[in-house]
Amino acid sequence: MCHPEARRRRGTSQTQAKYFFARAYIDERSLAVFAARDDGGDEFRMNAIIACGGTGGHLFPGLAVAEVLRARGHQVLLFVSEKDVDALALKEHPEIPFEKLPTIGLPSPFSPAILGFVRRFNESFRRCRSIYRRFKPQVILGMGGFTSTAPVLAGKMRGVPTFIHESNAIPGKANKMTARLVRAVLLGFKECAPFFPKVKTEVTGTPIRTELQRLDCKDAREKLGLSADITTLLVMGGSQGASGINQAMIKSLPSLDGARLQVIHLTGTRDERLVADNYRRAKLPAFVAAFHHRMEELYSAADFAVARSGAASLAELAAFALPAILIPFPYAADDHQARNAEVFVKADAAILVKESEILDDALAQKILPFIEDHGRLQRMSQNAAKLSTRNAASAVVETMEKYTTAAV
């Protein structure tokens, strides 16, 4: 059934950096956009760089900020990674120009891969400097991850106001490296502030995309071919799927036999057919897809979720008042997904289950109480809604505007 809360909510130094040879390429489409900027009038307009990408957890909040900046009349250029996940998501936003940077994650200092990291970082740094000479940014925002490091450093050396956003409850390596270069560190969780004791911090929440607005629950279920009045579980593994969660659901299907439940399951590319076949054999109603571009449909149709606990996913779950069974990615840096999940557990908006604990039908034993106790489901939904920061993108933009001057 569509729970009551768902029905209510519709709605480096400059002297060391010699003049690099090799100029970066900017595609004609981007240059055409920038050439068309309106310099007339008294209203403040910024050229803004947002460095995001590499995972959906960096990219989607960056896109959300870009949407608000553009709505306020600012020019925006995204810096993203060369990963397929970025290209796939940006196909849905052809109006936002972007550049790809060849950065990779920071390997161990003793790994042979460190040489490749340095080469790619230098290439990204040179490309940023070339683009900045043309675009003349007035503000730069890094969303974390090593796609953001070179742009923030190049911006600092140019004297441009720079900011970083840390969505997680514990900061990543890239943001810890660049924090002292920026005007302010913007936070998704207040619990992260103690990690930046010598830097100004502001808690904004984690931005979510403007299209993520609640739809009518029954209409959303109808679009997915599901029944209007059956408790609906959303299973998702983040922007790249999660084989561990997929396998746990498959093992749990026999124990869910006879439960008044239907499932929306995003599998990622590799497991889509396998998962769909298992739902059919179990005769459990399900909408199964590798990915889905209209996530607002899925969130609106669901009563609760099984999910990873990346910061972007948690922000979206809270925006739709969805309580969750959270299974943190066990190999996340510094176990940050577990720290994120703990915030929601403390608020009684989620339960935390380690991936090592979802053996046999263990996941089913966590799912069944949500189906059987609607009072608990409603209470946890209300608690999840209290964690929502739907205005986070606007808060990020307002902070950027506050610290930034119009001087070019």
Region annotations inferred by a language model:
Residues 6-14, 18-19, 24-41:
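A cross-taxon signal for low-complexity, glycine/charged-rich
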Residues 47-53, 70-120, 271, 356:
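Conserved nucleotide-sugar phosphate-binding/catalytic loop shared by glycosyltransferases and other
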Residues 75, 96-97, 156-218:
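Active-site-proximal region of nucleotide-activated glycan assembly enzymes
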Residues 108-139:
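An amphipathic, basic-hydrophobic alpha-helix
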Residues 389-408:
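C-terminal alpha-helical cap of glycosyltransferases
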